[in-house]
Amino acid sequence: MPRKAREFIDRPEALYHIVCRGNNKKRIFRRSEDYRRLLNIIRLSKKEFPFYFYSYNFLPNHFHLLVETREFSLSKFMGRVNFLYATYFNHRHNRSGHVFQDRFFSNIIDKEKYFWAVGCYIDLNAVRAGLVQNPKDYFWSSFSIYCQKIYGGDLIDRDKFLSYIGINDLEQARLDYIKFVEGKLCSEDAKTPVFIKSTKMI
């Protein structure tokens, strides 16, 4: 049965928290090459759909993204990413059918109030899932880039993300963000953050 069409509002220069889940909560990543393939698809898609890419976290059965649009269609971008990855995943693992549950979910985030809060929430996903005790130890997350454990290259717009703290010293901002995230490890906000309660799912 075809999926029902859903309403979606594209807003230029908006900050989106995006979530894509595996169909029936099944795994969408089985091997390291699967994670790398999705990252590469996103990297290549930035050339066609210019946007700011701030955070990601890839869990076994879903993934999170934090992006800021720049005069482009978010729905077209996500449609391309999910189509290319689903095509790869089905071929690579000799399967057919839907890879993702629905298409994607997104929240428009208030940049003035919750910019770092949503980044922190995304970076702590692997901790909440019980995969690691500290987010810096999870390889498939942008937090490892902010901690300089891996090289992000042209994938993450790190400096623009860090500039939102409002200080000119980006290295100090990076250290402040790491401290901010690690300070939320035992916080209730990390489980059900205020931005989730205050923004609209579309």
Label every model-predicted segment:
Residues 1-55, 59, 68-202:
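Short Pro-Cys-Gly-centered "Cys-loop" motif that presents a nucleophilic cysteine in a tight turn
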